[in-house]
Amino acid sequence: MSGWQNTEAKISISKREGRSLSTDRIADPRTGQFSNVQEISGRGPVWRLSQAWFQKGFEDQGLTVKVGRMNMGEDFNSAPCESQNLTLCGAQVGKTVSELWYNWPITVWAANLKYDLNPTSSLSVGVYESNPENTKKSKGFNLSTDGSKGVLIPIEFVWKPKFNGLNGLYRFGAFYSTADAIDVLNDENGQAQLSVEQREVHSGKYNTWFVAQQQLTQHQDNPKRGLSVLLNFNINDKATSEILGSQQIALQYKGMFDARPNDSMSLGVARTEVNKRLKKKKKLENELNQVTDVQDPAYVPIQYDETNVELNYTYNWSPSIMFRPNIPYVHQAGGRKELNDAWVIGLTTRLNF
């Protein structure tokens, strides 16, 4: 900003449109897919205020303060998005506890503080409004705090080492939510209950994560070219979370061909892990209703783990135009063993002006 050093302000408005292939062709409509083969799909085809924040850095103190409307994955659990599949793109915590952790394009009132411990490490903490009203299609520009259930408090340590001249970035983080959370299965006495009203209400919820980005090789003439690996793991509170967590690994080779030094090829695998307590609850419900036929409308689908794989090639035609042909593969969409595996041919395009 003019006249202000180390200061930045940003406002972004987004609009998503189109149909979801995962919903229309891949997943069981009773469960949906944990991921989505189109990462840009989700949260409704509506206009939204996706960023409206002010950030100020205090270089002498090593502090950066940020306040305004933002999403959690912008500054915590952040990871690159080098795939079209959702579970191989960006902050993964939002995919396993989407009722609390909001990624783009959702925003909430928030503030966070980053303190640089030394040139290679920092510690960040934030306070984010926990308000499900912001996810509604009719609340794309909601600025009210009406409907807030509490706050979500993330903390993260970031380390940026170099091993033999190869850049790395490691994130160790966790969050605690003060919003009430209903037990997946049991009441206060530890007895299984199918009725939501009879289950125990916990006074909070937590998650922990680890993200690693490490370059493994590089070219002598261009250190940006070479093989890199991305790891992304997160674990949820098993008492209150239907999804226990997710694991992701991806390999990317940038500049594989001398004639295309800015292009890259990636292969990623992601697993979404279902809480065993959720499976137990659904099996119990089917037993009580004496339903065994999966086609019966009264049958409650049992959900297991879901696996997503994607191979893609990123073609950077120019600094402002990118094409990414890709082949995603989905195993047990929505954790449904009865479904056939799905192969998809996709194309991501990106235009920057």
Each predicted region: which residue ranges?
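Repeated loop/turn-to-beta-strand initiation elements of outer-membrane beta-barrel proteins
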Residues: T7, Q61-V65, T120-V125, N164-L169, ...
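Outer-membrane beta-barrel "beta-signal"
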Residues: D341-F353
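Structural signature of outer-membrane beta-barrel channels/translocons
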Residues: M1-S2, Q55-E59, K114-D116, V158-N164, ...
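Membrane-embedded beta-strand positions in outer-membrane beta-barrel channels/transporters
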Residues: Q51-W53, A110, P154-E156, W209-V211, ...
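Membrane-embedded beta-strand positions of outer-membrane beta-barrel proteins
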Residues: A9-I11, V65-V67, L113, L123-V125, ...
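Outer membrane beta-barrel transmembrane domains
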Residues: F141, P154-V158, G173-Y206, T217-Q218, ...
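Outer membrane beta-barrel
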Residues: M1-S130, S241-G245, M256-K283
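Signature for the C-terminal beta-barrel architecture of outer-membrane proteins
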Residues: G94-H219, K224-D237, Y253
